[in-house]
Amino acid sequence: MKRNCNRIRTVLAVACLAAASGAYAEEIGSVSTNFRMTGSDKVVIEAYDDPQVDGVTCYVSRARTGGIKGQLGMAEDPPEASIACRQVGTIAFKGPIRQQDNVFSERMSILFKVLHVVRAVDRKRNTLVYLTYSDRIVSGSPQNSVTAVPVPAGTVIPVK
């Protein structure tokens, strides 16, 4: 009996950690793609505010697996994702930023797969470029999506 309680606690702790990994994502909407009695598969739209650049929000759409495993955070979501980043306010930098930096990441399975959003600076065009891709412990996915946010003329991108 005590052993079963420990297993339940472990599963709940892992599920809580998986849910907490997407703390910066704000779900904007979703559509069901496959009905299941225990929760449908969906395409979700999430917003991520760039933590180093005020006034820039990235919108990521990706598949999320339903069912019991999906509800517990144990399902492996497909690696496909699309990204669109936009200027949503006055662009202001909180400090110098790296030439290239992994600015967001969210687990797509309980242990193995992570969705990344990387920001790169195109100094020549005064533009922030955002790339999304997924990886896993053994191999990543070549599927990716890219978007760019031009920074207004006169605003210098402070690069470390």
Question: What is each PLM-predicted segment?
Answer:
Residues 63-111:
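Structured domain cores in non-transmembrane regions
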Residues 9, 39, 48-53, 118-125:
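Short, surface-exposed loop and linker segments with low hydrophobicity and enrichment for Pro/Ser/Thr
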Residues 2-12:
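Bacterial N-terminal signal peptides that target proteins for export
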Residues 26-27, 91-160:
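Low-complexity intrinsically disordered segments
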